[in-house]
A protein has these predicted regions:
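Donor nucleotide-sugar binding loop of glycosyltransferases
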Residues: 16-19, 43, 93
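Cell-envelope/extracellular polymer assembly enzymes that use nucleotide-activated donors
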Residues: 6-8, 35
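A conserved acidic beta->alpha catalytic loop
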Residues: 40-48, 90
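Acceptor/aglycone-binding surface of glycosyltransferases and processive sugar-polymer synthases
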Residues: 63-77, 82, 91-145
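Conserved sequence signature across two-component system core domains
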Residues: 9, 13, 39-41, 61
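Conserved donor nucleotide-binding strand/loop of the catalytic core
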Residues: 33-37, 48-77
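Short, well-formed alpha-helical segments that are part of the catalytic scaffolds
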Residues: 15-29
Length: 145
């Protein structure tokens, strides 16, 4: 069982001004995390300002480098013993972060999966299914999302 104070939350964000402040505020209200890092991946809106106003530490990319680069920037900067990566658009309920944290320390990797219902396009769904299958094969465990 990991304590939330040992967890850095890494949140890549690109033009998420409409949601990032609320997501950060809900995370902060739910637990005393080590830190919440929002990686502003070249946004042209108020993403960084709203994340900072809600209490996050913001790492800025001067231009869009992509989600993978944003996640890497956040993980490299994270000071917590554990790192939880979460989207800034609110598709994952922030309160679910604590449900994942209770498994940290028991396992080397904890993966949270979204519900089967999704708004993704058919092409994106097929791509996700392929990557999920590969991840499941490589880990020897079912990874549904």
């Amino acid at each position: 069982l990991a304590d939330p104070s040992s967890v850095s939350i890494v949140m890549p964000a690109m033009n998420e001004a409409a949601s990032v402040g609320g997501v950060v505020a809900r995370l902060r209200a739910d637990a005393a995390w080590r830190e919440i890092l929002v990686i502003d991946d070249g946004s042209s809106d108020e993403t960084a300002a709203r994340a900072e106003a809600a209490g996050a530490t913001v790492i800025r990319h001067p231009y869009n480098k992509g989600n993978g680069a944003a996640v890497k920037s956040g993980i490299r900067r994270a000071a917590g013993e554990f790192v939880l990566v979460m989207d800034a658009d609110g598709q994952h309920p922030p309160e679910d972060a604590r449900r994942i944290v209770v498994r940290l320390g028991e396992y080397d990797l904890v993966v949270g999966a979204r519900a089967a219902a999704t708004q993704a396009t058919a092409a994106r769904g097929a791509g996700n299914a392929l990557l999920n299958g590969l991840a499941s094969y490589l880990t020897g465990r079912p990874i549904p999302d």
